[in-house]
Amino acid sequence: MATTRFMARKSTLASLIAMSLMLSPAFAEEAESEEAAEKGYAELIADLAAQEGLFNFYRNTDSGETMLSLREEQLNTPFIYHAQTMDGVVEAGHFRGNFRDTRLIEFRRHFNRIEVVTWNPRFVFDENNPLSRAAEANRSEAVLAVLDIEADDNGRVLLKADPLFKSQALHRIAPWANPNQSGPRFSLGQLSADRSRIARERVYDNNMDVVVDYVFLNEEPVVFGSAAIADPRSITISLQHSFIEMPDNDYQPRRDDPRVGYFTQEFDQMTNPEWAPWGDVINRWNLVKQDPNAALSEPVEPIVWWIENTTPHEWRDAIRQGVEDWNIAFEAAGFKNALVVKVQPDDADWDAGDVNYNVLRWTSSPRPPFGGYGPSLANPMTGELISSNIMLEFVFMSNRWTLGELFSSGAALGDYHNFDDAHMYCSHGHEVQMGHMLGRLASDQRMYDDIENDPILVQALRHLIMHEVGHTLGLNHNMKSHGLWDNEQVHDAALTQGVIAGSVMDYNPVNIAPVGKAQGDYYSYKPGPYDLWAIEYGYSPALDDADAEEARLQQILSRSHERELAFGNDADDMRAPGRHIDPRIMTGAMSSDPVAYAIDRWDLVNHEFGELLDKGREDGQSHQRVLTSANMLFGQYAGQATVVSRYIGGVYVERAYVGQTNDVRPYTPVPRDTQRQAMQALNNYVFAADTLESMQPVLAYMQQQRRGFNHWGNNEDPRPHQMILNMQRNVFNHILHENVLQRLSDTAMYGNEYSLTDMLGDLTGGVFNGTHTTVSQNLQIEYVNRLIGIAGLEGGSGYDNLSQAAAVGQLRRIRNMSAPRRAGDSVSNHYGYLHLLIDRAFEA
């Protein structure tokens, strides 16, 4: 009896254990998998909504779960993968239309699973070279995801799609940690797969788009972000994953060359013994003539641009003109009507994010990351362009301040051009907006209700569109093209005729005429000579014979040394202190004599400060226009100080090849007279005791319009001493940079006649010019502290020996200065403090 009861209990216990195992997640999942395997392909998709095309995509309309189906022949075959932000928050590096990632991926079968693999195709081996057998040595592919095969029959494999798309397997959405950034930073937190969702999918014959709303959770945020974020504990980023079939056409890649500026696909030729074993190709569209024998022919397939239906009607003509004017350049390459513009119908059944369409898109963001942005998608193997978008922000058309904290509040003059993807990011829209504000102020114009009556805005919009379209054609920035005209010619509209620089890809300031001079063109709104030349190189049809084609390309490139074809991109420009060497490759510069142009701009700003109270105030309005205009004027003044400073210690760079001209010299130090002219300009306009004295009558009116409690905790009074000192510091950051001081000595060995001692002597003379104001006293203390740091008297110094010695010499010179007779207490105290700083430094 006892045995029977024991056996009964044992049987019951076994049953409970079995039931618990069946109910456990692992066992249930295994059972479900076995059940699915038994069902087969047809049965698994029987009740699912289907979209068929490149891949087949299935969705359970009750649960929302998704599945993906591939043909067997699509396995081990490369596809182009592309990630694009549909909507996001700027704090996390996301914004609508942001092209984020393009790579090759393959779906590879490994027994009962599919591996999603990516690799870097840049390393190229000659198949006939025995080294090609070791082509995979010391390289790492990346397995992004592993997916179980749910069914496999009739030449197709079926996979669950949710694990692939509701994770960061294909693309990292959260920003990478930046080891160089100190202090707290904005964080998305952790991805929540449960709250994320596959929002929509579009399946076509040659591509598939899957849009996923990724939800990140951060229960204890440290940095809350802007008002664009409803609640920093839960943030949604909408991202589109695109899979594109490799193009199957007769596209012929074109090689890159350092003398012309295109975006590229880089290839290292691993078996090539040449000095520069690179096989880089440029990004460009596949344009083919309808009539190959005609000098000018329409393309078989033009580049079609769509104006998004969100675009205000009154802007559309200027936008269309900005796109179509590129056809002028394409005629130099033998194409007529290479670009065509259409308008997206209001009832269009396609989305502007669809990679099958090139769309000019408009947004008005709470925190605009740009004025214009023109990314493109290229085949990583060939450089063939496949798709593009242009994102434009309404803020470019407005009077809104977009550069962060106001300068009048003490904001430093940082390099707001910097961006994680510097080669793709374009901040030119910000420059154009500030220029538009200056142009309107200088001409005493208010905002027009009708764009046709606003010549500044029409030219600015056409220019910005041309600039961003240029990026989508494959073109880099060209920060060296501003020297097309001299300082007089650039203001002559009869001469410039819409071309004030060699390229629309430059970052030129708005071209406002000096006081008393007739106004010329405000912007370049037609392609310049560099643009025509670059398009000819990139898009003119190739010859059939390889040797003849190479000779043809060399003939085009042999003109690169011509002044109107000058080129230098972001990798050369000097916008950041101490970085790069050629002052002619610089944002914000204009004319072949940027120092003279800067002096004209400084005089203009001083003039406009004198008239700002008359122009900037309106009855019944706050002083917001005065405040914003004053900050804009100050930014223009400071920007030209930056431009001029780059000539000191500069070196002209020439990338012409050997034999291209009679005397090809890659590096030529800036002439002594030019460097001295730049230093004299800085001494007169930036380091002078009366610098920006014209701003003083405006200071009492630089009041920000109150909004709720937004200014709580911050004093609202302007800080002119801090403003001016920040500008002066920004100049010091360059001309006293360790790279610049050492280059002044190094270049003396190959032609520089403006020595380190000369430069510091002129600088000291400008800073201590005999006139005493609180502005000059502020500057002198800053300068002495800089010299002490260079000399390393109070700690280590990263400067070379010659620079340290020169700094000591200037400190001794300053120590021998004294307050003038009958100087007031302020001046006497000031010199006493300077002597104390120097004495303590030497004693240390």
Whereabouts are the PLM-identified features?
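N-terminal secretory signal peptides that target proteins for export/translocation
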Residues: 1-8
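Bacterial N-terminal signal peptides
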Residues: 14-22
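Sec/Tat signal peptide C-region and signal peptidase I cleavage site
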Residues: 24-28
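Auxiliary tRNA-acceptor-end handling modules of aminoacyl-tRNA synthetases
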Residues: 29-311, 329, 333, 344-452, ...
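Soluble non-cytosolic domains of exported or imported proteins
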Residues: 61, 73, 98, 276, ...
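Sec-exported extracytoplasmic/periplasmic mature domains
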Residues: 324-335, 365, 470-471, 475, ...
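The catalytic-center signature of Zn2+-dependent metalloproteases
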Residues: 343-363, 369, 459-514
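Conserved catalytic/binding loops enriched for acidic/polar residues
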Residues: 452, 456, 481-844
